[in-house]
């Protein structure tokens, strides 16, 4: 009688081994994001280690003070993917298109805007095409050096949002130029951006950020200080003032764009919190980096709040500045970087 050999059960390798021991099936968000940054290795790019791009990545990303063992553990609180982003922003663009059609499709909406509304628009809206391009380049740099696709994707969607903002401002600029050719909408905006005293502290801040190359310092200066101040000034507070002056269209468009800024603040706070949870020393690193931009942020805030208040009788520069500081403090607290943390 021959004995049958016992059948050996072969343990099947899990499909999602790259995720480690998740204990669950990864989400669609994780599948299309996890471990997608191909530069996180000894030599970032498949070129000579001495090639400028490799030296740059090593110096400005891999050798910075902000340290986390695995950036792939970070998660965007909104779990945004390309698919969900496109659908979400398609809805937002449809909303803005309908606003424009509703207000300016027929009648003389722009021609009937008050002089105070036009003053606010020429000072604080149409020159922001240049500001938006600066913010777009800053977000793109944060994305390029991001140590994980989970982080980089957040920044790339922020980059796209900045372009959306530029496009919407440019569209309104053209409409306002047609309605008020003597006002200099469009034709005079570059001079305002480059020469108006109100804008120079802001322009200086953007230009200084554009030559800040260490990733942690660029992130801190952009997303933890300068950008949130600018978003509150020229999206939130400008929207409020235009509403008071009777320009409901531009107020609503800016409030819609402010929704993008709030999403940027969510992922920024989540990233700060994650970095501190992964390495307690990162709290000091980020606080120091933020402190390095404090004086610049205050100059931006004083210039922007003064610009808006000088063109709207209902506004008070000190009150605007205090409200923006409170929003900024809340962002830092949400990131685990507040004074009580």
From Swiss-Prot:
It is found in: Cytoplasm. The keyword Cytoplasm applies. It holds the Pfam family Phenol_Hydrox. Induction: Induced during growth on aliphatic alkenes (such as propylene, ethylene and 1-butylene), epoxides (such as propylene oxide and 1,2-epoxybutane) and chlorinated alkenes and epoxides (such as vinyl chloride, cis- and trans-1,2-dichloroethylene, 1-chloropropylene, 1,3-dichloropropylene, epichlorohydrin, and epifluorohydrin). Repressed during growth on other carbon sources. It catalyses: propene + NADH + O2 + H(+) = 1,2-epoxypropane + NAD(+) + H2O. The keyword Transport does not apply. Its main location: cytoplasm. It is an enzyme of class 1 (oxidoreductase). Keywords: Cytoplasm, Monooxygenase, NAD, Oxidoreductase, Plasmid. Belongs to the TmoE/XamoE family. Component of the alkene monooxygenase multicomponent enzyme system which catalyzes the O2- and NADH-dependent epoxidation of short chain (C2 to C6) alkenes to their corresponding epoxides. Also able to catalyze the oxidation of a number of chlorinated alkenes, including trichloroethylene, cis- and trans-1,2-dichloroethylene, vinyl chloride, 1-chloropropylene, 1,3-dichloropropylene and 2,3-dichloropropylene. This is Alkene monooxygenase system, oxygenase component subunit beta. It comes from Xanthobacter autotrophicus (strain ATCC BAA-1158 / Py2). The lineage of its organism: Bacteria, Pseudomonadati, Pseudomonadota, Alphaproteobacteria, Hyphomicrobiales. The gene is xamoE.
């Amino acid at each position: 009688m021959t004995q049958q050999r016992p059948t050996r059960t072969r343990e099947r390798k899990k499909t999602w081994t790259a995720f480690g021991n998740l204990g669950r099936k990864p989400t669609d968000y994780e599948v299309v994001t996890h471990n997608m940054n191909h530069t996180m290795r000894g030599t970032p790019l498949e070129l000579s280690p001495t090639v400028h791009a490799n030296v740059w990545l090593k110096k400005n990303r891999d050798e910075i003070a902000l340290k986390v063992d695995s950036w792939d553990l970070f998660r965007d609180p909104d779990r945004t993917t390309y698919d969900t982003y496109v659908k979400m922003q398609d809805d937002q663009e449809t909303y803005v298109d309908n606003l424009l059609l509703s207000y300016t499709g027929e009648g003389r909406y722009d021609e009937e805007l008050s002089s105070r509304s036009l003053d606010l628009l020429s000072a604080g809206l149409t020159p922001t095409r240049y500001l938006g391009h600066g913010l777009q380049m800053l977000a793109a740099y944060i994305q390029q050096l991001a140590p994980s696709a989970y982080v980089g994707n957040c920044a790339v969607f922020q980059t796209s949002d900045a372009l959306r903002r530029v496009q919407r401002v440019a569209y309104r600029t053209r409409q306002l130029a047609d309605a008020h050719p003597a006002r200099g909408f469009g034709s005079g905006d570059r001079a305002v951006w480059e020469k108006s005293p109100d804008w120079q502290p802001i322009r200086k801040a953007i230009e200084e950020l554009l030559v800040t190359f260490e990733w942690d310092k660029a992130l801190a200066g952009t997303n933890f200080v300068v950008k949130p101040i600018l978003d509150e000034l020229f999206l939130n507070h400008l929207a409020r003032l235009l509403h008071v002056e009777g320009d409901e269209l531009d107020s609503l468009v800016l409030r819609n764009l402010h929704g993008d800024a709030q999403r940027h603040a969510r992922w920024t706070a989540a990233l700060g919190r994650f970095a501190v949870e992964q390495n307690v020393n990162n709290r000091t690193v980020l606080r120091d980096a933020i402190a390095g931009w404090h004086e610049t942020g205050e100059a931006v805030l004083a210039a922007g709040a003064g610009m808006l208040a000088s063109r709207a009788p209902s506004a008070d520069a000190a009150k605007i500045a205090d409200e923006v500081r409170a929003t900024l403090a809340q962002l830092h607290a949400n990131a685990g970087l507040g004074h009580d943390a």
